[in-house]
Amino acid sequence: MSFENKSRHLHLWELAGLIALCAVMLSGLWAEGRQTSIAGSLVRLHVLAVSDAPEEQAVKLRVRDAVLECLTPRLADVHDADKAGAVLTSSLDLIRTAAEGAAGGRAVRVSLGEERYPTRDYAGFTLPAGRYRSLRVVLGEGQGHNWWCVVFPPLCLAAAEKEAMQPVMNFEDYALITREEGWEIRFRIVELWGELINSLEL
């Protein structure tokens, strides 16, 4: 191969690499925007047990039930995530009291902030990895297996349906998380991007 042909060959590879890099960056920006949009419609609940001992895992579930019982009437007439966040912020002491009542003397910490979540499958929909507003309930040192769900809209209960997402989400976000026909590849892009960012921030 002549020098001229080699040079042309290298330029083609460089161009292909540049195009691929641009495609990845654009996909990443789109994926980050979609995850941020999805997260902006929700509030997650994260309960961490003292340890993995069966007794502590049972306590974790009792605390979960007490927190949900406390929150259900307070969020019943709430229709957007920002309002839900405001209600939760003003109810942190009540939530802590409810959790302590079920914790059997264990230390309880309750906070509302942002947390990174992995990709998580629920009944009929999947939430991609990324940052979400999160009500965090920690028992003791929180070294045990955790439990998480979506507290707004109220999807923590067994009878909850994915359709509860529709009033609080735009069409594109809802189509993504429910993986409607034709949206599977786009969801996978969002999922992979979120998992990549999660791993970089560990």
Protein language model annotation of sequence segments:
Residues 125-183:
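Soluble extracytoplasmic domains of inner/organellar membrane proteins
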